[in-house]
């Protein structure tokens, strides 16, 4: 038997918040702020957005490792946060997240039509998230009521390691019956999510305007004047540079054009690991 390069994409592996649902990725961000506040520790929205894309326990651990947040915690408790302290914050985070996830459950405008088109062109739709399964079950339920059902879902606690490790993306490959990782494209609005796709050997597409990096509602995004929007694009492109996404687009609605381009590159023999 001889190896043959795939000639077209077989699956898109999609993130959830900031990619398909919750324009601006507000659901997790605000809850981090509220969870820390219950321990009398102030964390700003901007600080909370920093590690977005990681599993939520790891996200809280990363926040607690930031010197300014660790110092605020020390002033309240007389010590810097231990792993047990992180777990305590996480345990408060979880019910808050489940309780309020519905507030930010709307599909990103145009996403459903875009994904319907991808499926009509033969693509399977996998998905993964930094949410644990108990939260993802609720997210999936709410999305289904709005018409979106992924072919497979992998939560961050269903693999040994979450992002930026490749395990969740690869779990989708196995479950969907894809025969080559190079026939997959990973779409995400965070650096850890793009690294996940890169490490899994997939094509990667970073979303610039619909997710955590821009951090605006759909209405806020649409209201930006052209100069401000272009400046924000440049800032966010620079933020993603180290993770080396193959493509950067504003929202998932530009994905069909990317799919067409990737298929042309695959047909020419190009592979995602080589670029």
From Swiss-Prot:
Has keyword Hydrolase?
yes
Record protein name field: Phosphonoacetaldehyde hydrolase
Q: Name one GO biological process term.
A: DNA repair
Report the InterPro entries cross-referenced here: HAD-like_hydrolase_sf, HAD-like_sf, HAD-SF_hydro_IA, HAD_sf, PGP-like_dom2, Phosphonoacetald_hydro
The protein's organism comes out as Pseudomonas putida (Arthrobacter siderocapsulatus)
Q: How does it assemble?
A: Homodimer.
Q: Does the keyword Hydrolase apply?
A: yes
Give one GO term, molecular function aspect: magnesium ion binding
The record's catalysed reaction(s) read: phosphonoacetaldehyde + H2O = acetaldehyde + phosphate + H(+)
Needed cofactors, names only, are: Mg(2+)
Task performed by this protein: Involved in phosphonate degradation.
The residues that hold Mg(2+) are 15, 17, 189
Q: Give the matching Pfam families.
A: Hydrolase
